[in-house]
Amino acid sequence: VQFLINLFGVEVASQLVSRYFIATSKHWNGATVFWQIDTQGKVRTGKIMLYSPTTGKRVKNLELPVYWVHKALKQPEFELRQCLFGEHLLIDKIRPVAIVESEKTAVIASVYLPQFIWVAVGSLTNLNAEKCSILKGRTVTLFPDLNGFEKWSSKAKELSHLTIFTVSDLLE
C-alpha cells in the first residue's frame, strides 16, 4: 500500500485499495493481501505477499514467497477454489477485460488504462478454463509478462471456446 501511495498519492491509492479490497497482513511485517473475490462477492482466498515499500518489487528471499490467508488462519478443512484476482469487478458488463499475470500489475495498470477491467491470474501457468469460464462472451485482452507471449497465445487458442482472446505483446 505504501508503494501505491508513493506512486499515485493517497487519494488514488485509497481508491485502488477500496476497488481491489487490498489488505495488509502481520504474517510478514508490511505484507500485502490480495483477496480473490468472485462475482457473487464470495471471498475465495487471500494471497499474502511481501513487497518493498520503496521499490514495489517482491521480496523473494523468504522461506515461502507466497502464503495464503486460509493457511495463516489454520483452516485445515478449507477447500481452495481460486478465481481471478479482481473478478468481483466483472459485474461491469460494458468495459473490456484485460488479464495480466500479477495482482500488482492489474492494480497499477487500472490507473493507466482505466478503459479495461484489470484482473490477474496470479502466475504465467494459472491461465486456465476454470478461472476463465466467467469471461464467456466478453472482450478479453491478455497481457502476458516478458517471455510469456508464446505460452499465452497457445492458451488463448485452447480457451477460444469460452470467448475470443487477443494477446498483446506490449510487455514482451
Where in this protein do the model-derived segments appear?
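Phosphate-handling DNA/RNA-contact segment within nucleic-acid enzymes
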Residues: 27, 33-138
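Replication-associated primase and helicase/ATPase modules
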Residues: 1-20, 35-40, 96-99, 111, ...
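Short, small/acidic-rich helices and loops at N termini and domain boundaries
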Residues: 21-22, 29-30
